[in-house]
Amino acid sequence: MYAIIETGGKQYRVEEGSKIVVEKLAAQAGSEISLDKVLMVGGAECKVGAPYLAGAAVTAEVVDHGRGPKIKVFKRWRRNDSRKMRGHRQDFTTIRVKSING
């Protein structure tokens, strides 16, 4: 059985026991979360929501939090000899899917 969920503005295809990296969630590492924005549940019988399935949920465990690689943003203006350098690191959360209900 698999499900397509939405979290952080992105969609993920998950199965029981799978580990995925999503946008940062406000939950402690080791805690259990419920993702209720389920778009589709597939398996022997496929159910599709419009846009979400009512009563469907995916239970997952927060494995850990981390930060992605540093992205450098460089802006330069001609004639002024002006430039600006900024860096950014995106926060993420790794979760492990425990069960799919729906």
Swiss-Prot record:
The UniProt function text for this chain reads: This protein binds to 23S rRNA in the presence of protein L20.
- Similarity annotation: Belongs to the bacterial ribosomal protein bL21 family.
Quote the cellular component terms of the Gene Ontology held in the record. cytoplasm; ribonucleoprotein complex; ribosome
Which NCBIfam families does this entry report, sorted A to Z?
L21
A single GO molecular-function term is: structural constituent of ribosome
Assembly state and interactors? Answer: Part of the 50S ribosomal subunit. Contacts protein L20.
**Classification via InterPro entries:** bL21-like, bL21-like_sf, Ribosomal_bL21
Q: What is the lineage of its organism?
A: Bacteria, Pseudomonadati, Thermodesulfobacteriota, Desulfovibrionia, Desulfovibrionales
Identify the HAMAP family for this entry: Ribosomal_bL21 (MF_01363)
Biological process according to GO: translation
Protein name per UniProt:
Large ribosomal subunit protein bL21
Q: Does this entry carry the keyword Hydrolase?
A: no
Q: Does the keyword Metal-binding apply?
A: no
Q: Which organism is it from?
A: Desulfovibrio desulfuricans (strain ATCC 27774 / DSM 6949 / MB)
User: What Pfam families would the database entry show?
Assistant: Ribosomal_L21p
Going by the UniProt record, its keywords in alphabetical order are: Ribonucleoprotein, Ribosomal protein, RNA-binding, rRNA-binding
